[in-house]
Amino acid sequence: MIPSYVPPKYKVEVDPNRCMLCERCTIECSWGVYRREGDRIISYSNRCGACHRCVVMCPRDAITIKENAISWRSHPLWDVDARVDIYNQAKTGCILLSGMGNAKEHPIYFDKIVLDACQVTNPSIDPLREPMELRTYIGKKPKQLEFEFVEEEIDGKKIKKAKLKTKIAPNLKLDTPIMIAHMSYGALSLNAHLSFAKAVKECGTFMGTGEGGLPKALYPYADHIITQVASGRFGVNEEYLMKGSAIEIKIGQGAKPGIGGHLPGEKVTAEISATRMIPEGSDAISPAPHHDIYSIEDLAQLVRSLKEATRWKKPVFVKIAAVHNAPAIAVGIATSDADAVVIDGYKGGTGAAPKVFRDHVGIPIEMAIAAVDQRLREEGLRNEISIIASGGIRCSADVFKAIALGADAVYIGTAAMVALGCRVCGRCYTGLCAWGIATQRPELVKRLDPEVGARRVANLIKAWTHEIKELLGAAGINSIESLRGNRDRLRGVGLNEKELEVLGIKAAGE
C-alpha cells in the first residue's frame, strides 16, 4: 500500500476533564474519527472533515476541532494546495474529486458592489407601511398587448368589451424571486428533497429535481417543482415531464462546465435505481454533451419537442455554465423558443466534481449576468426570455445585486443546504454526510427530519424576502420588476475600469 504523505488537515481534541464517556461522538461521527479505549475516547484526526456533527451533539462541549497549524515550508509558486494535490494523486493515480464550488481566492464581485439608498430629495419607501411587490413571473413576455372589442349583451343592452388578443406564453408565478436549485435525488437524500419541497410550497416558489428523476414521495408537491432533462436522461418519461410546473434542459453546470454529472454507485439504492431507471449499485455517469444537441438548431428541436410532449402548457428553461461566450449562447437560447436561460457561476456547488474543473473552469456569475442581460437587450430579445442566476448566492444582498445586474430570479443551492445543517465540508461525494443531507445510508438519512428541515429552509427564504423588501424601500423602489437590470443603483468599490465596464456599473462616488 502506498503511504500518504499528507498530514491531517484538522486537529481533533477531546477534553478528558469534560468528557463523560457517553460515546455520543462515536455514534454521531460517520467517518470513524472516534473510538473508545478503556476510560478515554481516542480520535483519528486524519479522518476528520470538520463537519462539526460531534461538536454540536456532544452534551458536555468536550470536543474541539481546529485547523492543523503545521508550518509548511513557504514557496511563492508551490503553495500548500498544489503540494497536497500532488501527494494525493501520487498515492491514488486518480482524478481528485471535490464538492461545493470554486475554492480559489478569486474576487467575489458581489462583495465589491455596493447599493444605493434614497436621501432627502428622493425619499425612501417604508415597507412596513407601504406595499412592496416581489411577485415575479418567469417566462416569455409579449412585446406588446393587442386587444379586440367584442359585443356582449348584458341586461338587454349591447356593451363593447375589450378582449385580450395576444397569446400569453405559460409563465411560472413566484411570490419571491428565490428558488431552490436543481440537486438530484441520489446526490441528496429523500428527506432533504422533502424539506425543500415543503418549504417552497409554503413560500410560493419552486425547487428543481436535478437530473435524478422525481421520486413518488414528491408528487404531492409537483406544482412547485421544476423537472430537469440532462444528458443522461435519467428518469425522463412523459409522466415525469407532465408532473412538474416547468422543464429545465441542463447543458452545463457552473462547478464543472463541459462535463456531465457523476453519481457513485454506492449512492444508487433500490429506490434511486427505480427513479433513475438504471441498475442498482451502478455509477450514474452523464455524457459530457447531449448526444442529440450539437447546435442551436438541435437545441431548438429539443425545446419544441418537450413543449409538444407537455401540450405547450409548461415553460422550458435551458441551463448553461457561466463561460466566456455565455452572452452569444444566451442569444441562441432565446431564439430557440426557450422561456428562460439559467446561468450557473463557477462558485456554484456540486456533490461531486473533478477538483481541476471546480477550481479552474468558468467565470464569475456577476460578470455573466451583466453580460448576458446587456447582449439580450442589444439584440432586442430581453422580453423573449427570463434570466435565472445561480452559483454563489449567499444572502439577500447577493439576490438584490443579481437582480439589479439583470437577473429575473435566482436559484440557491448551498445556502439551502446550510439551512438544513450542512457545514460545507466538501465531501458530499463520499455518501457519508453526518447530517443526513448528501447521503443514502438509512441510519444517516433519518437524522434529517423533513418537518424541521422545511421549517428552517422556509424561515431562510422568508427572512431573505423581508430583507429584499427593506432594501427595495431604501432604494425608493416598490416593485422587484423595477429593480431588474437597474444597474444605476449599483456602484463598484476597488474595481478597475474594465471590470466596471463589463458589470455595467459606475465606480463609487460617480
Curated annotation (Swiss-Prot):
Disulfide bonds: none annotated. The keyword Lipid biosynthesis does not apply. [4Fe-4S] cluster 1 binds at residues 19, 22, 25, 58. GO terms for biological process: glutamate biosynthetic process. Its EC number is 1.4.1.13. Belongs to the glutamate synthase family. PANTHER family: ARCHAEAL-TYPE GLUTAMATE SYNTHASE [NADPH] (PTHR43819:SF1). This is Archaeal glutamate synthase [NADPH]. It comes from Methanocaldococcus jannaschii (strain ATCC 43067 / DSM 2661 / JAL-1 / JCM 10045 / NBRC 100440). The lineage of its organism: Archaea, Methanobacteriati, Methanobacteriota, Methanomada group, Methanococci.
